[in-house]
Structures are given as structure tokens and as C-alpha cells.
Amino acid sequence: MHTLDTVDASSLRTDIPDFRPGDTLKVHVRVVEGNRSRVQVFQGVVIRRQGSGVRETFTVRKVSFGVGVERTFPVHTPVIEKIEVVTRGHVRRAKLYYLRDLRGKAAKIREKRENRETTEA
């Protein structure tokens, strides 16, 4: 079993920022079309993060032209160029599936306020 752990540890990424459900992310995804490769940005709210280690995934939801779009990404996949945290959200749940039923302002997530002591120190 230790050999599996070492293989898993070698394929983990270290450039992933700390993010939680409720945070708004910009996920830069490498898309291959034929022989060309380009980077596509997917910005939305993290509605879940599950698993651990190499198998850890997160789901990002956005509303595009009135249609809700959700994409699930493995955290440690090489397809992701980078992840940017746009805003930190203040939520009380680990899985935000209830956002699927909300529209407009009701689907808005409160922004987390930073403590002054931690930012000044």
C-alpha cells in the first residue's frame, strides 16, 4: 500500500490555492482543438469539494445566458493551468446544491470579511 501512496504523492500539485465552497474562482483550463491548444477561463462559485489526495474534485457553477452550467474538475489535473480565487464567500454548508434552485439576487453569496489582525500581522 505504501507504493500507491508514493505514486499519489508524486502526482499531487503544489500550486493550488486554498479555496472552499462559496468562493468564486477563475479556473484557467487548457482546451485542445485539433492541433491547437488554448486556455479557457471558467469563472463561477464552488458548490462542492470532495475526496482527498489525487482523487479530490471540485465543482464550479456559473449562470451563462440564463442557463446554469456546472463543471467538475479534478484538483490535481494537468489540464488546469491555474486557479485564481476572486472572492471568498461566507456560507454555512459544505455542499451548496441549494444554489441550483435559486435565481437572481437570491443566489448571491455573502462575501467573507477579513480580520484586521490577520491582515496587518
From Swiss-Prot:
GO molecular function terms listed in the Swiss-Prot or TrEMBL record: structural constituent of ribosome
Record-level GO cellular component terms: cytosolic large ribosomal subunit
Q: Name one GO biological process term.
A: translation
Keyword Transferase present in the record's keywords: the answer is: no
Which UniProt keywords are given for this protein, alphabetically ordered? Ribonucleoprotein, Ribosomal protein
Cysteine pairs bridged by disulfides in the record: none
- Classification via HAMAP family: Ribosomal_bL19
Q: Which family does it belong to?
A: Belongs to the bacterial ribosomal protein bL19 family.
Q: What is the annotated role of this protein in its UniProt record? A: This protein is located at the 30S-50S ribosomal subunit interface and may play a role in the structure and function of the aminoacyl-tRNA binding site.
The name under which this protein is listed is: Large ribosomal subunit protein bL19
Identify the gene encoding this protein: rplS
